[in-house]
Amino acid sequence: MRANEFIKMLLLACLCLLPAIAVAAEPAGEIARITGDSIAQARATDGSMRKLEVGSAVNTGDAISTGKDTTLIVRFADGSRFALGPQSEFVVDKFSYKQGAEDNSFHTSFIKGVFRFVSGLVAKSPGRDMKVKVIVATLGVRGTQVEGEVSARQEKDGVRIDASAKVVLLEPEEKGKQTSIIVSNEFGSVIVDQPGYGTEIPDEKSPPSAVRKMQLHTVDNVLRSLRSSVRQGGTPRPRMP
């Protein structure tokens, strides 16, 4: 009897582990390109660190960070591509994609640095549950290409400097397609629906600024070498279903 009970408990324990194993077996995306000499790494939810190379898996919960002269592109399973500049960091908070499903979702958080992303099929699926956090605001994405810059909270000479962010809507890859982002926080929200325009959140207690024409030279300069790869290279454009 005791032997049977032990076997049952062992089988139950194995069954409980199966979902975790299944999740680990299917990464959210992979590293499509890395440039620069310093390291790029991922911190998993259990705190473990691993060096990133072209082809490395990116999993839900990973915090991806770059060194002082490193840039990279992450290609996700739904066709989304994220380009990250030097000394930058973002977290894959949630990723769930299955072709034809209505509950697809993709949530990320940019912690610091510069970025550019091209949304994929999650942003075009029925639920359109794609959200990008930039510390001081959240971007609701509706099939688009965006660049931005995030400054993390810091302390200088004993004075706290709030986090801040700037985001700009870019021309969509598919000509003639409607594109927009909703930028919101607890103090207000704006809709940016014209390429070349954007908004700024100057601190942690302010609403997004009025939409205006913007160009982030810092982002353009840093990611210039990656721009062609985001649009072409080894990262194919996502196709509409």
Model-flagged regions — what are they?
Residues 36, 77-78:
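Residue-level recognition of beta-strand termini and adjacent short loop/turns
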